[in-house]
A protein has these predicted regions:
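Metal-dependent nuclease catalytic cores that hydrolyze phosphodiester bonds in DNA/RNA
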Residues: 1-138, 234-240
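Short cationic/low-complexity microdomains
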Residues: 31, 208-219
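Short helix-capping/linker segments at secondary-structure and domain boundaries
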Residues: 57-63, 182-185, 226
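Mg2+/Mn2+-dependent nuclease catalytic core
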Residues: 119-122, 126-212
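Polybasic (Lys/Arg-rich)
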Residues: 214-242
Length: 242
């Protein structure tokens, strides 16, 4: 069985943790003590997962538990958590699901985006691995077309997406995925609440910034966690010029 096949079967589990990924960038640059430690899912993560599944793998939507409650403080919601066999601390509310379903409907209803996302020959949720900077990295591409990688995003503000892209390390994601799959990345984005949409391409400056982040993250990883680590993680501190 190839490394890629093993990773496809256990992307988020023990096998997946052998690799670095873009989701590790924040921890390595901001809080390396939290590197590779399990974290409880947040509401934006859960909503993002549902949106991606509805857009790309709708046959898996039954995996999501939906609770018809007004808030997460209600008795109905708390009982649903207690009675669930799932190891989770959060479910989607019905009203949240309804909003996400509307986002899916709107994005699918845009002819340009529909043709890009569902073009014949596209592949979905494809895993890639590669040695970058002396370490093995992984990535899972939402959509790969004949020409590019398409990543679907939700945002609270289309106007501020360019700033969110830096904050949430979409620049390093675009650079890493270019290395993994050999194609440029574009982002198709939908704004929560208003359902306004946008298509964002990646400039050379954006990619260079992502490459620089990856380089710094690799330095931290190799210093504190790599096979030839030289320093104790408890000695880490952030050093910046104001």
């Amino acid at each position: 069985m190839s490394d890629t096949t093993k990773l496809e079967q256990d992307y988020y589990g023990k096998e997946g943790k052998k690799y670095l990924s873009n989701s590790d960038i924040w921890a390595l640059l901001k809080d390396p003590e939290s590197f590779k430690k399990d974290k409880d899912p947040t509401l934006p993560m859960l909503q993002g997962s549902y949106f991606h599944t509805a857009m790309l793998e709708p046959h898996l939507l039954d995996d999501f538990t939906i609770v018809d409650a007004s808030t997460r403080s209600t008795k109905v919601y708390k009982e649903a958590l207690l009675n669930s066999p799932e190891l989770t601390n959060m479910f989607l509310l019905q009203k949240e699901k309804d909003s996400l379903d509307e986002m899916v409907r709107v994005m699918r209803g845009n002819l340009t985006f529909f043709e890009l996302i569902y073009a014949s020959g596209n592949t979905y949720e494809q895993v890639g691995v590669k040695n970058i900077g002396g370490e093995m990295w992984k990535g899972k591409a939402d959509i790969i077309t004949s020409e590019q990688i398409i990543d679907l995003k939700t945002t609270t503000s289309i106007e501020d997406f360019k700033y969110s892209a830096y904050k949430y390390n979409y620049d390093s994601q675009a650079w890493i995925y270019n290395q993994l799959f050999g194609k440029p990345m574009i982002f198709i984005v939908i704004e929560k609440n208003t359902y306004r949409m946008g298509l964002f391409t990646c400039s050379e400056e954006f990619l260079d910034r992502g490459k620089e982040k990856v380089g710094r993250a690799l330095d931290v990883y190799q210093k504190f966690f790599g096979g030839s680590a030289t320093e104790d993680i408890n000695q880490f501190f952030i050093n910046e010029n104001l």
